């Protein structure tokens, strides 16, 4: 599948300017590497055009848009900060190949990476990146819309909690983080809400809220209306969510919640166990994000920046998952 075109980056086309060193780099690396697989099968052209259009004719980024987009993905695949991303790009040929950095080009520094991230936020482009990728995955048959899973998880704030001493020292508080309780423990931070397809466990939607937000109130934001059935835990069992599913003719796979005046029958409990066997697969996605993509704690302050972080982590997760699926299919 065709990869990024230099034409849309508002810089001279380097297609005929390859050096001997470029050709040598191109031959390095394994063809079944995750990054090589992503580069081979995913087309970033539309995403690059979307970002490049925001610069207009009068300005351009210090580095090619395609390079910076791929740097964002690398950061969220491997949990790299801006300084770490700059350092790793200087040292690792596999990273240079993935971002398509030519031998003549300088590695983007941490300031350039930070400014590019800020542009994505200011232009609202981060909201479209996951959708652009998923359109490609759907066309290739990897996202199956029939069954959708929904769930949420708590993520710690980068600030432990509001601190009078820290505020006096000039350190900014995290105004959008909030307190909640889980398992009788106090928690301060945010909540990540996602939906995924049940077959290949690819993320379809991803939304960040403050920690105290109730899962059921975010249901309509993460539940796609084009699915046939939705599975989730008891937190989503509300009249409003049931009405929304009936309106869109979606089969209700939400576990039934009992109450002090409504006792669950034996059939209800058996049905809940059946639904739980389906919906628990989404918990593996959160486990992967927290262990391998370092999402136990958010990196930024505020909902907007942390929404970008979750979106890019979802993009990176889907790309890594796609590479894994393709490798299994090739065996």
List the predicted regions and their residue ranges.
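Phosphate-backbone recognition surface of nucleic-acid-processing proteins
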Residues: 97-114, 252, 260-270
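Helix-centered, glycine/charged polyanion-binding patches within enzymatic domains
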Residues: 228-229, 234-308
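Basic, short loop/linker segments at the boundary and entry of helix-turn-helix/winged-helix-like folds
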Residues: 28-73, 77
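Polybasic low-complexity intrinsically disordered regions
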Residues: 83, 87-90, 100-104, 108-248
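C-terminal domain-tail junction helix/linker
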Residues: 309-313, 320, 324-331
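Charged, often Cys/His-bearing segments associated with DNA-binding zinc-finger transcription factors
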Residues: 1-45, 325-331
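Secondary-structure capping and boundary motifs in well-ordered enzyme cores
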Residues: 43, 60-67, 105-108, 274, ...
């Amino acid at each position: 599948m065709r990869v990024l075109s230099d034409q849309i980056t508002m810089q001279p086309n380097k297609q005929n300017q390859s050096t001997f060193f470029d050709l040598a780099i191109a031959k390095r690396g394994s063809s079944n590497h995750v990054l090589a697989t992503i580069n081979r099968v995913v087309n970033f052209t539309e995403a690059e055009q979307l970002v490049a259009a925001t610069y207009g004719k009068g300005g351009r980024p210090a580095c090619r848009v395609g390079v910076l987009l791929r740097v964002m993905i690398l950061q969220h695949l491997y949990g790299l900060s801006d300084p770490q991303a700059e350092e790793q790009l200087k040292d690792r040929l596999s990273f240079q190949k993935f971002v398509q950095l030519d031998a003549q080009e300088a590695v983007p520094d941490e300031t350039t990476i930070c400014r590019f991230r800020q542009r994505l936020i200011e232009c609202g482009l981060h909201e479209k990146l996951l959708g652009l990728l998923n359109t490609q995955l759907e066309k290739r048959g990897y996202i199956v819309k029939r069954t959708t899973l929904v769930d949420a998880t708590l993520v710690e704030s980068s600030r432990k909690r509001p601190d009078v001493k820290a505020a006096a020292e000039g350190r900014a508080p995290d105004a959008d983080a909030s307190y909640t309780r889980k398992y009788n423990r106090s928690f301060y931070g945010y909540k990540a809400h996602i939906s995924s397809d049940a077959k290949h466990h690819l993320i379809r939607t991803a939304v960040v809220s403050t920690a105290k937000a109730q899962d059921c109130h975010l249901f309509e934001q993460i539940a796609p209306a084009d699915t046939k059935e939705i599975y989730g835990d008891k937190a989503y069992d509300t009249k409003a969510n049931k009405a929304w599913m009936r309106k869109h003719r979606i089969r209700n796979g939400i576990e039934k919640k009992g109450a002090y005046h409504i006792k669950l029958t034996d059939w209800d409990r058996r049905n809940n166990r059946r639904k739980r066997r389906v919906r628990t697969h989404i918990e593996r996605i959160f486990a992967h994000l927290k262990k391998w993509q370092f999402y136990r704690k958010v990196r930024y302050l505020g909902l907007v920046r942390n929404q970008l972080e979750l979106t890019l982590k979802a993009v990176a997760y889907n790309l890594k998952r796609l590479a894994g699926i393709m490798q299994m299919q090739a065996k």
